[in-house]
UniProtKB/Swiss-Prot annotation:
Protein name, as recorded: ATP synthase subunit alpha
EC number: 7.1.2.2
Residues that coordinate or bind ATP: 169-176
Organism superkingdom: Bacteria
Record membrane topology: Peripheral membrane protein
Length: 502
């Protein structure tokens, strides 16, 4: 066997030519302390605030505290596998979540990973979780209604697309039910819904998902769940992940509804992280920037101008109060950030008024201009009527002999309360709402016994579907109130067929 020197030298030259001498440089630090979802690392001198870092076991973290000599990192996942002395390296990226159509109908965690057992989510689009809110000139005033399907809200505290309406109340007063009914009612409205569950029991989230599925609402909904058993960093990030997923659709000219259930648990998780990071505590031990935490989240809700596609993102944040105290720190913060609030009262809830909306303390600051014209006309006096009824009701308990005017106000008030009651998961279309409230305010229900009001409404809705489809269609399509003759004619025609209980 002969060895040819030319072949060997040619082969060596080829190998040398293809040799790459690129050096991969990554800044690496060492974990010096770990526990409770927090790690401190030494050696990441150039890391930036909010930058994503990677631990040696593959778990990611977010750099939060940039101190002299060490960096405070919140760990996004299980911190049990990280120990003192492990390496941690910079990624040079900020945190992003997967977004897009592929997430619709899925249940994901705040990192965008599926937790519903239905396989991987295939999308190549990612959005950063923190983004600057749109400026004043990029926005348009709120002018389109968001129909919740709940009479008490659409009549008394209307919500517009792009608005931020706080839902506030004690635990077990029906806050989540209001949100679920609103999501179910968007079926015909071509709206994307995102339900963010923060610190909820996993069984509760499962119940919500099943309710949405049974009502055909899961097809246009994304559920982001950070359950109570998950570490505080994930509870803190969940709302930001939800709004980032929503912004993808808003930027494409679509309408989005994001429900944050609830932000008091996010504030508690943020307080926990801040105290572990040794940030100075303020009122109620919350850090000084807890207001900024919620304001930068809720400011991302917007109604965009036509040049940017005219999309909208409506936010329904929840706050849980303790013993109906809306003057506590977090409730007052969020009330001052939002465009109004719906206050659910436990006394009303337990007395059978459901949804338990306190009309006196609830307000919508911008929704009035977005209300359907027909509803605006018929529900104009409803709030005042209800307020004067509540006032008279308190006095009426002391004396029995009341003058005629007071008695008629009390009678009308009782019927108003009955009309505004509604069953669970039974949102009502705007035309049916307008007709029953018209019947109420014009006195057509004054001769119907209070106990029959709910039955009267149910039977009238069925009768209207059979005999007055054109009337309902006119209200739905034009948003205007038909002539008084047409309305009175429909109501009196139905009343002839209605038999009150003896």
């Amino acid at each position: 066997m002969t060895i040819k020197a030319e072949e060997i030298s040619a082969l060596l030259k080829e190998r040398i030519a293809s040799y790459g001498s690129e050096i991969e440089v990554s800044e690496t630090g060492t974990v010096i302390q770990v526990g409770d979802g927090i790690a401190r690392a030494h050696g990441l001198d150039n890391v930036m605030a909010g930058e994503l870092v990677e631990f040696s076991n593959g778990v990611m973290g977010l750099a939060q505290n940039l101190e002299e000599g060490n960096v405070g990192i919140i760990i996004l996942g299980d911190y049990k596998g990280i120990k003192e002395g492990d390496s941690v390296k910079r990624t040079g990226r900020i945190m992003e979540v997967p977004v897009g159509e592929a997430l619709l109908g899925r249940v994901v965690n705040p990192l965008g990973q599926p937790i519903d057992g239905l396989g991987p989510i295939v999308t190549d689009t990612y959005n950063p979780i923190e983004r600057k809110a749109y400026g004043v000139m990029a926005r348009k005033s709120v002018h389109e209604p968001l129909q919740t399907g709940i009479k008490a809200i659409d009549a008394l505290v209307p919500i517009g697309r792009g608005q931020r309406e706080l839902i506030i109340g004690d635990r077990q007063t029906g806050k989540t039910s209001v949100a679920i009914d609103t999501i179910i009612n968007q079926k015909e409205e071509n709206m994307i819904c995102i339900y963010v569950a923060i610190g909820q029991k996993e069984s509760t989230v499962r119940g919500v998902v099943e309710t949405l599925r049974q009502n055909g609402a899961l097809d246009y909904t994304i559920v982001v769940s950070a359950s109570a058993s998950q570490p505080a960093p994930l509870l803190y990030l969940a709302p930001f992940a939800g709004v980032s997923m929503g912004e993808y659709f808003m930027d494409r000219g679509q309408h989005v509804l994001v429900v944050y259930d609830d932000l008091s648990k996010q504030a508690a998780a943020y307080r926990e992280l801040s105290l572990l990071l040794r940030r100075p505590p303020g009122r109620e031990a919350y850090p000084g920037d807890v207001f900024y935490l919620h304001s930068r989240l809720l400011e991302r809700a917007a109604k965009l101008n036509d040049e940017l596609g005219g999309g909208s993102l409506t936010a329904l944040p929840f706050i849980e109060t303790q013993a109906s105290d809306i003057s506590a720190y977090i409730p007052t913060n969020v009330i001052s950030i939002t465009d109004g609030q719906i206050f659910l009262q436990s006394d009303l809830f337990f007395s059978g008024v459901r949804p338990a909306i306190n009309a006196g303390l609830s307000v919508s600051r911008v929704g009035g201009s977005a209300q359907v014209k027909a509803m605006k006309k018929v529900a104009g006096t409803l709030r005042l009527d209800l307020a004067s009824y509540r006032e008279l009701e308190a006095f009426a308990q002391f004396g029995s002999d009341l003058d005629k005017a007071t008695q008629s106000k009390l009678n009308r008030g009782q019927r108003t309360v009955e009309v505004l009651k509604q069953d669970l998961n039974a949102p009502l279309s705007v035309d049916k709402q307008v007709i029953i409230i018209y019947a109420l305010t014009k006195g057509h229900l004054d001769d119907i016994p209070v106990t029959d009001i709910r039955r009267f409404e149910t039977e009238m809705n069925a009768w209207l579907d059979q005999n007055r489809k054109d009337l309902c269609r006119e209200i739905r399509q034009t948003g205007n109130l038909p002539s008084d003759e047409a309305m009175v004619d429909a109501i009196t025609e139905f009343k002839k067929t209605f038999s009150p209980s003896v």
